[in-house]
Amino acid sequence: KHVLLLDSDDAYLPDSVSLLVETAERNKAQMVSFNFETLFPDGSIGERPVEYSFPDVKTSTGHECVEYIYAEHIGYFSWAFMYDRQFLVDLHILYPQGFALLEDALFLNKILRQCSRVAYVSKPCYRYRITEGSLSKRTSLATVDSAFKSLSEIQRIAHSEGSSIRFDAHIVRLYLYIYT
């Protein structure tokens, strides 16, 4: 009934999945955005790598959720959402293939614009492990080219709806991310 994504070196925190399912069903949400904690290579646990605090709301539209991403309250992590399976099937939006970087951003930009209700869980439900040599830390010409393709498609999607000032600032940060 629900779909969760899990990176191979990450983990869901105890009782999180039941909390997410309960939240989705109580709010009749097509997606649930949830908070997470970060496990660093030295073993310490810290804040999530997102600039501002997690949104203090119970539900929103998908468009409002996109604005939370642009304002850096939510990160571009597809694993930080739970999806209603039937919603995914009905949309026919597949996870982008052939992208080495920013595929999460492209997927979320497409799917959130089709989502009428997103619920939020501010309690950390996921442990995101930062590892040395991860794919997101590797820079090659193919990786950069892939990221540019993702960003180009995201810009096309946003501009077709009329992009916001927040989007413009956000896309600049994403371009800078490619180079760091």
Where do the language-model regions lie?
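Nucleotide-sugar donor-binding/catalytic module of glycosyltransferases
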Residues: 1-161
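Alpha-helix N-cap/helix-initiation sites
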Residues: 101, 168-169
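Flexible helix-coil transition and linker loops at the boundaries of alpha-helical arrays
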Residues: 160-168
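Non-catalytic, C-terminal membrane-associated alpha-helical segments of glycosyltransferases
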Residues: 169-180
